[in-house]
Amino acid sequence: VNPADHQPAPGHEIARLLDDVDAYAARLGTSRARLLDVGLISHATGIEPERVRGLLAGEPPEEEPREKNARELFRKALFKERLRFLQRTRLKETFAGREPYGLREISRATGISAQHVSNLLNGERGANHDHAARLEVFFRVPEGFCSRTEGAALIAYLRRMVNEDLPKLATRAVLQELGARSVALRSTADGAQIDTLRDLLPALDELVKVIQGKQSGGAQEGGRERP
């Protein structure tokens, strides 16, 4: 039995994660659109902005073909798209402004010949794991950036939001409501702090209600006239 057969379809997983985003948006008194910046998602995933909008609106993500030859062509085209995206969006600072890196600069930094880099950008060659890793390091993106399908890339982004960023944001909002002026929340390597934050949120919500209830009761008592 292939374990992949028991994994939720990418479209269903994206929908589930978006439901979680909606729940946090309601808690924070905002909207999904305010929490999900299309430009930031595009920059972080390598998916073009228009396609990001489509995926967030429920369009099904493109999946890797099962047939071997079709799968190899798909991976080659995907790598080309991601590499071109990086060359276009990860720019170097120059006196004239921000400019894309040239083939020779990429070649010198990665040890991959300029001709081979050109072939990768044109989709004429596929990249092996070593070349992909060197290029991802050069452009300062996570491992797998150039090979993840759009569904996998968006799922990874949304999971980080739901499991890390939004729990921090929600906890910070509750603590500030409780009167904490400065709240510093840092993630740890094993994610233990984030799990703790998610577990604490319901208790913090109850604490806010208790304090607000006491404040409301005190205000009513103070407003009564003494006999």
Listing of model-derived features with the role each one plays in the protein:
Residues 154-227:
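Interfacial/linker helices and their anchor residues that mediate assembly or domain coupling
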Residues 39, 103-108, 115, 133:
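Residues within the helices of the helix-turn-helix
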Residues 1-34, 39, 50-103:
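A short, Lys/Arg-rich alpha-helix, primarily the initiator
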Residues 49-55, 140-157:
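Short C-terminal boundary/hinge segments that cap the last helix of small helical domains
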Residues 48, 102, 113-116, 128, ...:
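Short coil turns linking two alpha-helices in DNA-binding domains
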